């Protein structure tokens, strides 16, 4: 399984456990990490929450897009070529454009759009991460935000426009 602190970002504290003893060790590690007074001050009770998910093998991708009336416009589809198999999941490399076959890319776009609609997202930025497992697209996360950290620096649009400027222009209807 995979343990994910819900209050952290950038895959911080995301740990894989393959057996009960590994789960106990990973959970204790997270309890110590999440006991940080500064983190507790910022996050309150939520800073202690941990999500536990099944581990899903497969090739991982990330999609950046904008939604307009529920329709997805893909801005970038990134391959994550490093195998993200655990025990930690630090993402070090993104490749764009994706090298996946066009049919697979279309399935990813469709799955992201349907997931965003199911979450009630209709307008604005969307960041999604998925894995391709046994030929199927599995959503790992989908959120009404842009890619985190300094990763947006990888993207430049018409006239050198940044991702942030593009999102602001979209919000203003331009």
Give a label for each model feature.
Residues 106-128, 143-174:
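Active-site "cap" helix and flanking loop/linker of ATP-utilizing ligase/carboxylase catalytic domains
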Residues 8, 55-58, 120-123:
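A short catalytic or substrate-binding loop motif that flags glycine-/basic-rich loops and adjacent residues
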Residues 2-3, 20-57, 88-94, 113-118:
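Conserved ATP-binding module of the ATP-grasp superfamily
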Residues 93-96, 156-157:
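Short glycine-enriched, charge-decorated loop/helix-capping segments at active-site entrances
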């Amino acid at each position: 399984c995979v343990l994910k602190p819900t209050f952290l970002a950038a895959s911080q504290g995301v740990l894989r456990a393959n057996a009960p003893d590994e789960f106990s060790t990973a959970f204790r590690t997270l309890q110590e990490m999440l006991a940080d007074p500064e983190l507790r001050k910022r996050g309150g009770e939520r800073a202690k929450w941990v999500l536990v998910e099944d581990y899903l093998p497969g090739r991982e991708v990330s999609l950046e897009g904008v939604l307009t009336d529920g329709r997805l416009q893909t801005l970038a589809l990134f391959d994550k070529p490093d195998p993200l198999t655990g025990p930690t999941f630090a993402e070090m490399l993104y490749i764009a454009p994706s090298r996946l076959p066009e049919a697979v890319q279309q399935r990813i776009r469709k799955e992201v759009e349907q997931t965003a609609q199911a979450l009630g997202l209709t307008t604005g930025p969307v960041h999604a991460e998925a894995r391709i497992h046994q030929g199927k697209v599995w959503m790992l996360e989908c959120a009404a935000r842009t890619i985190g950290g300094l990763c947006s620096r990888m993207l430049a649009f018409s006239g050198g426009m940044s991702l942030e400027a593009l999102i602001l222009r979209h919000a203003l209807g331009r």
